[in-house]
Regions:
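Glycine/proline-enriched, intrinsically flexible loops and inter-domain linkers
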Residues: 1-317
């Protein structure tokens, strides 16, 4: 409905642009030009996207090369090491969970509704059960999916849960599949965190951001020094676009993260001017912005005073 952007009133996935399934872009060490053309023909800045894709493919190819070199050197020991690293992460997570008091811990957060069709806040409910050395996250009671683009695809819900577990369990635990093995997730089909097709999902990050907030709220009683209060709970961005250099048919598209800051804990202030939870992105420096986008001039860019929650430790600005 809104080319190149997300329509706030999209009521179907088919209104949000072309759908591209998982397809090969390279095969037998050769680029598949038709697939690249499909991607580039659907963007206003094909040169930028081609550069991005080429860089990602090159990085992956180097990664493949390094793994092959390591395997030729170490053989089956390398694979055994990889398996042990996954098992180690699982043991570490389960060891932490085993120290927690068994029980059920619940919390409800809310995401803003969408326009006149959904004026009321939508609940995201989670009940977390600690049983022995495993965790179960149950989203029963969460709002039903809606005909608006903030539904969260189930893989994103899983990612939000696993992010939250990793954040609470310790930053020295290797991030891999082992963390996930200690976690069970229940998300009823048709709710806003496990929608069915063709529910729109273009702005899902604004709802997905609330999932860690709900989880941290539920687990705060047993992680008092680690869990943080809610941040701005959204992915706030600015998109500017326009004509490029005079005398050319080029265009520019500038997408900037305008972060709202993170929540505080009982032992430290919240971070200011950064995205947290599911985005963790930083802003683009003004100098780099003005050099790359010559039609953009920043007059002022600063933190707004007194926008963090007050307290002994304040929220981020």
């Amino acid at each position: 409905k809104v080319p190149g952007s997300t329509s706030g009133d999209a009521d179907s996935l088919f209104q949000e642009g072309i759908r591209i399934p998982v397809i090969r872009i390279r095969e037998r060490d050769q680029l598949i030009p038709s697939v690249l053309d499909l991607l580039l023909d659907n963007t206003r800045v094909p040169q930028e996207r081609e550069g991005d894709l080429t860089a990602q493919m090159s990085a992956n190819l180097i990664g493949v090369q390094r793994i092959q070199e390591a395997y030729r050197r170490y053989g089956d020991d390398l694979e055994a090491c990889m398996k042990e690293l996954v098992a180690y992460s699982e043991r570490r997570v389960r060891a932490v969970v085993a120290t927690l008091p068994d029980g059920e811990y619940s919390y409800t957060d809310y995401v803003d509704g969408c326009g006149d069709k959904y004026p009321d806040p939508l609940p995201i409910r989670v009940k977390i059960t600690v049983a022995g050395d495993s965790l179960t996250f149950d989203f029963t009671g969460t709002a039903q999916q809606i005909k608006a683009p903030i539904n969260v695809p189930y893989p994103c819900t899983k990612a939000a849960v696993f992010f939250s577990v990793k954040a609470l369990m310790g930053d020295d635990i290797p991030a891999n599949e082992g963390i996930n093995r200690a976690v069970n997730i229940i998300a009823p089909k048709g709710c806003i965190v496990n929608p069915t097709e063709p529910s729109p999902i273009g702005a899902q990050i604004d709802c997905c951001q609330r999932i860690p907030d709900a989880i941290f709220g539920a687990l705060a009683p047993i992680f008092p020094d680690t869990a943080v209060t809610a941040g701005n709970g959204a992915c706030t961005t600015t998109i500017l676009a326009g004509e490029g250099a005079i005398g050319t048919d080029s265009v520019f598209i500038f997408h900037e993260v305008i972060a709202g800051g993170g929540g505080a804990s009982r032992i430290f202030d919240g971070l200011s001017g950064v995205q947290v939870n599911m985005t963790n992105t930083s802003n683009m420096p003004i100098e780099a912005t003005e050099m790359e986008f010559t039609k953009i001039l920043a007059r002022k860019y600063e933190l707004k005073e007194d926008t963090g929650g007050a307290g002994q430790f304040r929220g981020g600005l």
